[in-house]
Amino acid sequence: MNTAHLFPWFILLNPLIAAVLILFATRKNHGVSATISVLSAFFGLAAALCAWTLPEVHSSVMWLDFGKALQVPLGVKLDHLAKTMLLVVTGIGFLVHLYSTVYMEHDESKARFFGHLSLFMFSMLGIVLADNFAMMFIFWEDRKSVV
């Protein structure tokens, strides 16, 4: 069974899962939020590096279907441009995460910061992997609400 079409979804959903974990797992222990977020960014960078070995992937599911009048798929596209931008976004994102662990070390709202940072990474990766303008617009607007 070929699972290459699931790989872009893993890259996209990785920071979202990290943000949810930070939301629920760090109510008592705020120090673990940085670890979860940095590990998520590291796995995203490692996955972006591994994506170069994959062929071009296009995977989508129908999101909105109003017959022939309007059909909006929800999908990801992993081509050479997306692979390049994945390296840029995950590489810079990982460095930001590393810097933030030291910068936010004594801050009381560290868990909230790393949760928002993971959501921001999710939005940026969504823009990179979007296969249509509707999906790109959704992730662009989500990015502005996180910041």
Residue ranges: model-predicted function:
Residues M135-M136:
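Short hydrophobic/alpha-helical segments at membrane-entry points of transmembrane helices
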Residues L13, L39-F42, G91, L119, ...:
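Hydrophobic residues within alpha-helical transmembrane segments
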Residues I17-A19, L119-M124:
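Hydrophobic, membrane-inserted alpha-helices
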